[in-house]
């Protein structure tokens, strides 16, 4: 019988083991683009994810390179509605950069419904995009860090609506509420190797839904 190598363990988070490479999902536009640009300006190598807006993602990459020519940002396409695509995205970024230390789950589905109009299709779509995809990406990143014996961080974008509740965007709000709970549980389960936190921005950049 072949012996299985033990999983490397850590007694505490070690920032020196955290590669300065970050994947930002939904980084082609709005808040995701701003986050990617800030990371690049701060010296992080940035992987720019997009689903269908390749031109916007390339624009973000160009902006990052202008802010810091040394970071050499790359773009990656993936449909996060597919769990296998989530795994493949983490693997592709890790292979392209050699390592991955941070994940910013910025991509989100934000479609209007309410308590009377919501249905199974709307709930399922929001759940997959806003809850399951961030969880799956976090799981894959954790295993990547185990393989590299590194440390990392995940930032989940939540929404101020969770603390200023109103009945519109019903499916979206429920999916973000689930992500907020998942953030706490993942942080407890994956520490100290992987830090998982959430931030809940208010109105920051123009949304096509609200313009």
Which sequence ranges carry the predicted segments?
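Amphipathic alpha-helical dimer-interface segment in Rossmann-like NAD(P)H-dependent oxidoreductases
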Residues: 129-149, 187-192
């Amino acid at each position: 019988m072949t012996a299985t190598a033990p999983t490397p363990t850590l007694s505490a988070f070690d920032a020196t083991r955290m590669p300065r490479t970050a994947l930002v999902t939904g980084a082609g536009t709005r808040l995701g683009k701003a986050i990617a640009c800030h990371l690049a300006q701060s010296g992080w190598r940035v992987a720019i994810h997009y689903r269908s807006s390749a031109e916007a993602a390339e624009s973000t990459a160009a902006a990052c390179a202008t802010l810091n020519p040394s970071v050499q940002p790359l773009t990656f396409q993936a449909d996060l509605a597919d769990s296998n695509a989530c795994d493949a995205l983490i693997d592709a970024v890790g292979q392209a950069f050699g390592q991955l230390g941070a994940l910013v789950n910025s991509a989100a589905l934000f479609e209007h419904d309410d308590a009377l109009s919501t249905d199974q299709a709307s709930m399922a779509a929001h759940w997959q995009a806003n809850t399951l995809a961030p969880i799956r990406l976090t799981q894959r990143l954790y295993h990547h860090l185990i393989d590299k014996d590194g440390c990392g961080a995940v930032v989940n974008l939540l929404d101020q609506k969770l603390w200023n509740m109103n009945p519109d965007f019903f499916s979206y709000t429920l999916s973000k509420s689930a992500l907020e709970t998942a953030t706490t549980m993942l942080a407890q389960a994956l520490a100290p190797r992987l830090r998982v936190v959430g931030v809940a921005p208010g109105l920051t950049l123009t949304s096509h839904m609200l313009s």
